[in-house]
């Protein structure tokens, strides 16, 4: 039980019994099952934070639209076959002042890693374009199916041309169907519920650290109890 208490405190209370089971077994080379860990956490009165779901829609007149080619096929046989993207809002606090920031990110379905991201003070085309350019620069041979919602940045003709020049096919969620971009929504849920809602960010750098933690230190059951970057490296070996 000491291991559980130590990990719970170390991770600021973000670990539910499933994540706790994976982390205990990875750290201590044990084979506890999730039922036992759940029971021990109940005895210790340890609970993880619950996720909050928020759906925001921005009306716009699209210049370019695409079919939902992804069609909720949330799996891939190798890295860089399918990328998902989205933008979401965060806040951080400098004294009593509240500052809004926006996170644009691209996620690989295969290993659930964040391929690239950008943090900005405005939810605009430039934020999305820079995120995409970074992903292409770091993965010049990648030509994935590129899926997004129908936000104004992604229905922009300039962005569509950028995708075509990079040799990527464009796919878009149906109107009002957040589940069509499910893994991306799942990433937002993890980031916000485990690393954001628990405390107030005091700088943009804290958001950067949270993303790096997700990519390199957060184990996932669907990734054979590896982190996204571990799973990515194993596939490339």
Language-model segment annotations:
Residues 1-78, 177, 227-236:
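Basic, flexible linker segments flanking DNA-binding modules
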Residues 10-13, 27-29, 74-76, 93-94, ...:
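Conserved, non-catalytic sequence blocks in retroelement Pol enzymes and Pol-derived host proteins
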Residues 50-55, 145-150, 164-183, 199-203:
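RNase H-like polynucleotidyl transferase catalytic core
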Residues 72, 76-115, 122:
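An active-site-proximal beta-strand-loop segment
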Residues 81, 113, 121, 133-137, ...:
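Retroviral integrase
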Residues 99, 118-139:
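Active-site beta-loop-alpha junctions of metal-dependent nucleic acid enzymes
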Residues 157, 164-168, 190-237:
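C-terminal domain-tail junction helix/linker
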């Amino acid at each position: 039980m000491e291991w559980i208490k130590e990990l719970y405190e170390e991770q600021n209370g973000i670990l539910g019994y499933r994540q706790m089971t994976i982390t205990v077994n990875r750290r201590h080379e044990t084979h506890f099952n999730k039922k036992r860990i759940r029971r021990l956490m109940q005895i210790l009165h340890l609970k993880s934070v619950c996720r909050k779901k928020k759906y925001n829609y921005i009306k716009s007149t699209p210049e370019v639209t695409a079919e939902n080619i992804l069609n909720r096929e949330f799996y891939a046989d190798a890295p860089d076959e399918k990328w998902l993207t989205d933008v979401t809002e965060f806040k951080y606090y400098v004294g009593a002042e509240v500052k809004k920031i926006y996170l644009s990110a691209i996620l690989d379905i295969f290993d659930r890693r964040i391929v690239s991201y950008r943090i900005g003070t405005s939810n605009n085309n430039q934020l999305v374009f820079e995120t995409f350019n970074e992903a292409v620069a770091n993965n010049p041979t990648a030509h994935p199916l590129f899926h997004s919602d129908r936000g104004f940045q992604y229905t922009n003709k300039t962005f569509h041309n950028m995708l075509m020049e990079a040799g990527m096919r464009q796919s878009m969620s149906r109107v009002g169907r957040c589940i069509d971009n499910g893994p991306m929504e799942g990433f937002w849920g993890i980031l916000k519920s485990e690393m954001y809602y628990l405390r107030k960010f005091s700088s943009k750098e804290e958001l950067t650290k949270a993303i790096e933690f997700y990519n390199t230190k957060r184990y996932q059951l669907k990734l054979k109890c590896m982190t996204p970057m571990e799973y990515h490296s194993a596939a490339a070996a």
